[in-house]
From Swiss-Prot:
Annotated tissue distribution: Expressed mainly in flowers and to a lesser extent in leaves and roots.
SMART domains assigned: FAS1
The protein's name: Fasciclin-like arabinogalactan protein 8
Gene3D superfamilies assigned: FAS1 domain
Organism the protein comes from: Arabidopsis thaliana (Mouse-ear cress)
Main localization category: membrane
Feature: compositional bias, Pro residues: 339-371
PANTHER family: FASCICLIN-LIKE ARABINOGALACTAN PROTEIN, FASCICLIN-LIKE ARABINOGALACTAN PROTEIN 8
Domain of life, per lineage: Eukaryota
């Protein structure tokens, strides 16, 4: 009887494990790689780094444009404007074909990635989705007076409740997005933006040291700036900059910038060491990143610093404020780890008396190492109408933390069975 119960429990446990392992991450670039019709759209997702933002999120819908529709959009506008337009095609909700054709009351507004940029006044960051006659679905800006100028054409790929990719026949145009001038990243504009963002000390140091010109020389190919606030320079533990040599000040300021465009989404998905403008050799003056929820933490080897706000995001330039001065280990030494406690003196334990029966508990095996804790998907997920040929490459399957608990249950069940 006990053996039968144990077998049933084990079967149930491993069924749960099989279900849990179906939870997937996604890679939009790889999903679209096998669809030549979207090669232009896919390329612009990479150029604008929107691909990283999409990959860092779940419960998301991407409205893709074929090469013809994408060419009409991209041929007339700078990259920063294209990024804004494409951000309107990324919905922060999951819409598969079934849900799309069964919208409550026939119409709804959906939040887009553009809404999260802080550049969308009013409801410009929302999209109107409306079910039309004949089974058609229309899309348009949520701005007052906007028309449904875009229509759903077909499904491309679904990873249920994680990401849905749908094709539409035209871009969704929000008033003012395509006509907005591209933000400037000139010398005067950078310092002005920094001062307005509460980073006057940092801006003054860039000018007085001449490092601002180094920043300017990197603008064309890509520049990411981490600007400490004025309060950050007053914080306890920040060294007296007047005691640094000119070369050390230059290295410190160059350490606060990257010679590449790396917006927040790219920093969130980063797994490698990041070179800075101060990097002069392998492993020198670099940074690493980690995430906590939606926050990005920069690590220098001395002390962490949190990404606070986005001052400017104008491809290929992005400027962030950070809440601590970035202190490179090459100048200020690595943070000291606490000394290990002395080992306790060995104690001779008394001889235990024999037990009447073996213990019904067993130690659970350690959880397998993992970089992230993926979320589980609902069990009633619908099936997508089209699948990518490279599903294994585009979908990263990882085991959730539930694994440990389930294996523990199985181990206890086996132990109980043996004791019975």
């Amino acid at each position: 009887m006990a053996a039968s119960q144990t077998f049933s429990l084990l079967a149930f446990t491993f069924s749960l494990l099989a279900f849990a392992s179906t939870v997937s991450s996604h890679n939009i670039t790889q999903i679209l790689a096998d669809s030549p019709d979207y090669s232009s759209f896919n390329s612009y997702l990479s150029q604008t780094k929107l691909a990283d933002e999409i990959n860092s999120r779940t419960t998301i819908t991407v409205l893709v444009l074929n090469n013809g529709a994408m060419s009409a959009l991209a041929g007339k506008h700078p990259l920063s404007v294209i990024k804004s337009a494409l951000s309107l095609l990324v919905l922060l909700d999951y819409y598969d074909p079934q849900k799309l054709h069964k919208i409550s009351k026939g119409t709804t507004l959906s939040t887009t990635l553009y809404q999260t940029t802080g550049n969308a006044p009013g409801n410009l960051g929302f999209v109107n989705i409306t079910d039309l006659k004949g089974g058609k679905v229309g899309f348009g800006s949520a701005a007052s007076g906007s028309k449904l100028d875009s229509s759903y054409t077909k499904s491309v790929k679904q990873i249920p409740y994680n990401i849905s990719i749908l094709e539409i026949d035209a871009p969704i145009i929000a008033p003012g997005v395509l006509t907005a001038p591209a933000p400037s990243a000139s010398l005067s504009n950078i310092t002005g933006l920094l001062e307005k963002a509460g980073c006057k000390t940092f801006a003054n140091l860039l000018v007085s040291s001449g490092v601002l010109k180094t920043y300017e020389s990197a603008v064309e190919k890509g520049l990411t700036v981490f600007a400490p606030s004025d309060e950050a320079f007053k914080a306890e533990g920040v060294p007296d900059l007047t005691k640094l040599t000119q070369a050390e000040v230059v290295s410190l300021l160059e350490y606060h910038a990257l010679a590449e465009y790396k917006p927040k989404g790219s920093l969130k998905t980063n797994k490698n060491n990041i070179s800075t403008l101060a990097t002069n050799g392998a492993g020198k003056f670099d940074l690493t990143t980690s995430t906590s929820g939606d926050e990005v933490i920069l690590h220098t080897g001395v002390a962490p610093s949190r990404l606070a706000d986005t001052v400017l995001d104008a491809t290929p330039v992005v400027i962030f404020t950070v809440d601590n001065v970035l202190l490179p280990a090459e100048l200020f030494g690595k943070s000291k780890s606490p000394s290990p406690a002395p080992a306790p003196e060995p104690v001779t334990a008394p001889t235990p008396s024999p037990a009447d029966a073996p213990s019904p508990t067993a130690a659970s095996p350690p959880a397998p190492p993992t970089d992230e804790s993926p979320e589980s998907a609902p069990s009633d997920s619908p099936t997508g109408s089209a699948n990518s040929k490279s599903a294994n490459a585009a979908v990263g399957v990882s085991t959730p933390s539930l694994f440990t608990a389930l294996v523990t249950i199985a181990a206890i069940a086996v132990s109980v069975s043996l004791c019975s």
